Amino acid sequence: MSSGETFRPTADFHPSLWRNHFLKGASDFKTVDHTATQERHEALKEEVRRMITDAEDKPVQKLRLIDEVQRLGVAYHFEKEIEDAIQKLCPIYIDSNRADLHTVSLHFRLLRQQGIKISCDVFEKFKDDEGRFKSSLINDVQGMLSLYEAAYMAVRGEHILDEAIAFTTTHLKSLVAQDHVTPKLAEQINHALYRPLRKTLPRLEARYFMSMINSTSDHLYNKTLLNFAKLDFNILLELHKEELNELTKWWKDLDFTTKLPYARDRLVELYFWDLGTYFEPQYAFGRKIMTQLNYILSIIDDTYDAYGTLEELSLFTEAVQRWNIEAVDMLPEYMKLIYRTLLDAFNEIEEDMAKQGRSHCVRYAKEENQKVIGAYSVQAKWFSEGYVPTIEEYMPIALTSCAYTFVITNSFLGMGDFATKEVFEWISNNPKVVKAASVICRLMDDMQGHEFEQKRGHVASAIECYTKQHGVSKEEAIKMFEEEVANAWKDINEELMMKPTVVARPLLGTILNLARAIDFIYKEDDGYTHSYLIKDQIASVLGDHVPF
């Protein structure tokens, strides 16, 4: 590079895998009578509702039905019925010495998922005199799977559930490795071991569970429920594709792909991320604004990480803090486009929110956006100076720059009356559940993305900060951060079982889903940057209809 050239640490990100895939032409809009479909949907829904409210004298059957309704992704239709059923099931079976491992585990998990902090002492009866889980349990594969799933509902200090994860993981892996289970059961075990239900995105689990039921001859699965779930999934699929069609038009009009070629072009991946946050039809507005704001922030992130000079970035940071269109004149040409797009997006959201009488909420998202970009600026300076901070100095800045408080705030903008002014004040004070989601985001991102980022030139991640400060290996640092992530999950579990909850349960469920999205994206690699790694899963929930 000649002395007159400007150094830009570009990353050579791969292009969009989807581009205009979801863009509809005039010929795609056909006049279809949806009346018959809706009538069938309503009829099946009422049948399922009756199933949930009936069979009061069959609690084990009721437990299984509720579990299937939730895993198939249709529980949002029956929230009151499920809540009533769970409350009635609270005192049943847990204290009974006759209840088997599967029943106790399923009951425990369903109650905790509903926010009821039932004691983990219910599993003590499955231990032997030496305090270990009984060896006889190893042959109860269904019970072992249920215990494994239940154990991920743990909070800090529940050592019996930590032991349960270790016990079930070891023996379930052994059963598969030694071919002691059928191929179908082995596939179910591997699916659970790779990602437990607590960490699974609802749409992906629904799609998997439908396929799993389809391929089994188990007559216990309810065909009415399955058909309702398939129909509901397909109806929502059309809605989600239409949302992506509109977002693709917005993306195409921006033409960032041509004008800002250094940045990751990940519109569909971001929509999928936001679909993981909430998929229900009433949150269509939320998905739209989340995708738009997160797409713009992703462009800004890459501008700070992979293109802008320190002088340019300082100007952009100042412009964002001013938040005034007049500040655009101080920016270089390529940044003017980004800045105008950012302000335009917020202005449009403010207008839409004004129609709901909630425009006052938008300022919280603006403030979080400013905090994120301020953190980007600090990290850009660190990189420019070759500075590696201590982990104590790094984490407060990095927890802001991971932008999950901003993302959570954006998601709440789309949740209507649940998200009051008091809720946004609560978020801005960084409560435990929000911090836990940010810890999961930052540390998983750093653990999976740091090698790619360091090769191209990037601010030090948590890995580099910790290894330099403490003189330990990368492997030791990762092990410690994995424990921190596990504890953050336990903090989320604890907050979702607080009585009374500080904010409405749907809001807490959104934070849980955002943590799940991180686990999906960053479990083995940086699936957002290298998005070909998650293309098949995106296609599974945004592709073809589920066949009947």
UniProtKB/Swiss-Prot annotation:
GO biological process, one term: response to ethylene
Signal peptide per UniProt: none
Keyword Magnesium: yes
Essential cofactor(s): Mg(2+); Mn(2+)
Binding site for Mg(2+) 2: D301, D305
InterPro entries found in the cross-reference section: Isoprenoid_synthase_dom_sf (IPR008949), Terpene_cyclase-like_1_C (IPR034741), Terpene_cyclase_plant_C1 (IPR044814), Terpene_synth_N (IPR001906), Terpene_synth_N_sf (IPR036965), Terpene_synthase-like (IPR050148), Terpene_synthase_metal-bd (IPR005630), Terpenoid_cyclase/PrenylTrfase (IPR008930)
Top-tier EC class: lyase
Binding annotation for Mg(2+) 3: D445, E453
Catalytic activity: (2E,6E)-farnesyl diphosphate = (+)-valencene + diphosphate
Induction text: Induced by ethylene.
Entry remark concerning the domains of this protein: The Asp-Asp-Xaa-Xaa-Asp/Glu (DDXXD/E) motif is important for the catalytic activity, presumably through binding to Mg(2+).
PANTHER family: (-)-GERMACRENE D SYNTHASE-LIKE (PTHR31225:SF205), OS04G0344100 PROTEIN-RELATED (PTHR31225)
Protein name: Terpene synthase 1
Native organism taxonomy: Eukaryota, Viridiplantae, Streptophyta, Embryophyta, Tracheophyta
